[in-house]
């Protein structure tokens, strides 16, 4: 009976350790993904701002011709 208790304890302990390692890796992956999303948003904002300036400049040129 004591052998079964020790075996069960060992199995549960090893399961918890592996579970905590997986959770830690998952959190690191999510943090990396968040950083990538922020970089993508930053690049998109720059492109969007440049597009607005380009359109405003083009509209100004069109208005000068009219």
Curated annotation (Swiss-Prot):
Keywords: Amidation, Amphibian defense peptide, Antibiotic, Antimicrobial, Cleavage on pair of basic residues, Secreted, Signal
Cellular component annotations (GO), alphabetically ordered: extracellular region
Tissue specificity annotation: Expressed by the skin glands.
Signal peptide: 1-22
Residues excised as propeptide: 23-39
Valine amide PTM positions: 66
Compartments where found: Secreted
One of the GO BP terms on file: defense response to bacterium
Disulfide bridge map: none
Function: Has antibacterial activity against Gram-negative bacteria E.coli ATCC 25922 (MIC=80 uM), K.pneumoniae ATCC 700603 (MIC=310 uM) and S.choleraesuis ATCC 14028 (MIC=310 uM). Shows no hemolytic activity and no cytotoxicity.
Protein family membership: Belongs to the frog skin active peptide (FSAP) family. Ocellatin subfamily.
Name recorded for this polypeptide: Ocellatin-PT4
